[in-house]
Regions:
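Active-site acidic Asp-centered loop
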Residues: 99-101
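N-terminal nucleotide-binding beta1-loop-alpha1 segment
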Residues: 1-19
Length: 199
C-alpha cells in the first residue's frame, strides 16, 4: 500500500497564501487557499490512494471534520515532513507521498504515476517551476534527506535531489508542474481570477 500525506493549514485569513496578501488582501488569499485545498482533496480521493491530512495546527473547519488527520510535528518544515513520512510508512508498506495544497496542475494520474515509480525507485519528486517541488515520495526516510535545505527558495528541489543522491537513494523526477504563490501564478488559472473577482 502507498499512502498520501497532505500538508495543510487552517484556511484562516492572514495565515495562508501570505505572498498574495499585498496584491489581493487576506480574505481573498484565504479563499484562494480554500479552493486549492478542496481541489487537492478531490484529486487525492480520485487517485484511489489512501491519504491522511497533516495540519499545522488544530482546526474545527468543516473541511477537516470528516477527514483523518494528524498535527504536524517538529520545528521546521524538514522536521515536519520527516515525522510525517515516519508516521505514514508505519502502515504504508510500499511507500508514501507528501504533497501540499497549492498545485492546481496536480492530477490523480500524477499521484498514481508517482506511486508506481516507487516500485523501482526509493524516492520520487515532482518538481515545481519555482524551484521547489509539488510532491515528494519515498519508500524509506533518512534524517539527512531534508538537512540544510533553504526552504522557500528556488534551490529546494536541487538541494533535496543532491541530499538523496548522497544518501544513495535511487531517485526519479516526473513532470514539472506550476504551483501557486504569487499574483503572476494566479493569471494562469481563470477559475481563480473569477473567484477573486466575485468575492
Amino acid at each position: 500500500m502507498i499512502a498520501v500525506g497532505i500538508f495543510a493549514k487552517p484556511p484562516y485569513p492572514g495565515s495562508v497564501k501570505t505572498r498574495l496578501i499585498p496584491d489581493i488582501g487576506a480574505a481573498k488569499a484565504a479563499r484562494v487557499y480554500r479552493y486549492c485545498l478542496e481541489y487537492t482533496l478531490q484529486v487525492v480521493r480520485e487517485s484511489g490512494l489512501e491519504y491522511q491530512l497533516f495540519l499545522s495546527e488544530t482546526c474545527d473547519d468543516v473541511l477537516f471534520q470528516q477527514e483523518e488527520h494528524s498535527l504536524q510535528k517538529g520545528d521546521g518544515l524538514g522536521q515536519r515532513m520527516y515525522h510525517a513520512f515516519q508516521e505514514l510508512l508505519d502502515t504504508a508498506s510500499d511507500g508514501a507521498l507528501i504533497i501540499g495544497t497549492d498545485c492546481l496542475d496536480l492530477t490523480p494520474m500524477h499521484l498514481q504515476d508517482a506511486a508506481r515509480s516507487l516500485a523501482d525507485h526509493e524516492l520520487v519528486l515532482i518538481p515545481a517551476l519555482d524551484g521547489g517541488y509539488a510532491l515528494i515520495g519515498c519508500t524509506t526516510i533518512e534524517p539527512g534527506l531534508f538537512r540544510d535545505l533553504l526552504w522557500s527558495t528556488d534551490k529546494v528541489y536541487r538541494q533535496t535531489f543532491a541530499n538523496a543522491q548522497r544518501l544513495n537513494y535511487r531517485v526519479t523526477s516526473l513532470e514539472t508542474l506550476r504551483d501557486i504563490d504569487t499574483l503572476q501564478d494566479l493569471e494562469h488559472y481563470p477559475e481563480l481570477l473569477a473567484l477573486i473577482a466575485s468575492s
